Amino acid sequence: MGAVTFLIGCLPSYASIGALTPALLVILRFLQGFMVGGEWGGAMLMVVEYAAGKHRGRLSALSQTGGLTGQLLATGVFIVVTQLPQEALLSWGWRIPFLLSALLVLPGLYMRHRLDETPVFRAFKKQQAINHRQQRDERPVVKVVREQWRSILLIIILRFAESVPFFLATVFAVSWATTQLGIASLTILYIVMFTCLLAYPMHVLFGIMSDRRGCRQVYIFGALFVAAMAFPFFWLLESRSLILMTMGYVLLINIGHNSLNAVQPSFFAGLFHPPVRYSGSSIGAQLGAVVAGGFTPFIAKALSAVYDNSWTLVAGYVVLTALASAFAAKIAPDTVLPHSP
């Protein structure tokens, strides 16, 4: 994944190879997203299956802050890069964030090679050997799609309440506030950075809540809160007040989004059996990210264009998707993962 990100920064310009440049960019972005699924699933399961049962929620919530750290670093680098002259930014400055990703590859490889399989998975492999079924009859991907496709579908729906408001606030709202409200893009980016910083303690808080109340209850709360905050978020944004706009982001992201994101590792992993947990969690989560999050900026842009760049339909879309996630959480089993041996 790190190599693919670095290669994006090395792409030749359109003037050099023409239409091949955007084609290569699409391919690299596809590969990047594909590999993120494997990285996220592996990191999440390592924490979930190593963690002691009564502290699993808070510890697995910390694993989700890795993405927030990336968002924080990316936003910070982007703010620095945008200080370059426009010509330099468009010529070579945009490459800097991608090239800097190479600095993270070696530490990641070092940590990866020092990790062993989790106790839960080792216990499963031991039992498998005892039962004389060392040869797997079916690949995990095929097995999980055939046997636990309902869990995959549930995760896709569950991700709407988490992904839609996140991409709405960090992508669509930045552009919309700049063009329609005349708010400087840097102002919104600073607010986004603040919410990223606040997300660290909020993830721990919601992780602790999941240990006490269960993942499903926290997820239902978060989804309903997102639905309730869809319209107020835009009202606060329209105020053009830094304090009120920040409040809108804190409510939608740090309470709504963070409560959902924090419990996803334990919640999603608990929906699958150990031999297919990695594949099932990753497939469901990443398909959900594509369907729920990837298309959100485009859907929001199209909906806003219906009524002369109004946000009303956009907020309505957030409400509907959040309610769908709340229903999915209601019917999903709040599975308790076994304690690590």
Q: What do the predicted segments below correspond to?
A:
Residues 108-115, 267, 319-341:
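Multi-pass alpha-helical transporter architecture, strongest
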Residues 83-99, 302-320:
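A membrane-interface helix-boundary motif in multi-pass transporters
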Residues 18-37, 243-259:
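Hydrophobic core of transmembrane alpha-helices in multi-pass small-molecule transporters
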Residues 202-215:
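Helix-to-loop junctions at the C-terminal end of transmembrane segments
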Residues 1-18, 224-240:
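C-terminal ends and interior cores of transmembrane alpha-helices
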Residues 1, 212-223:
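Cytoplasmic membrane-interface "Motif A"-like loop-to-helix N-cap segments
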Residues 57-82, 104, 282-296:
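Glycine-rich segments within core transmembrane alpha-helices of 12-TM secondary carriers
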Residues 148-198, 293-297:
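Extracytoplasmic gate region of multi-pass secondary transporters
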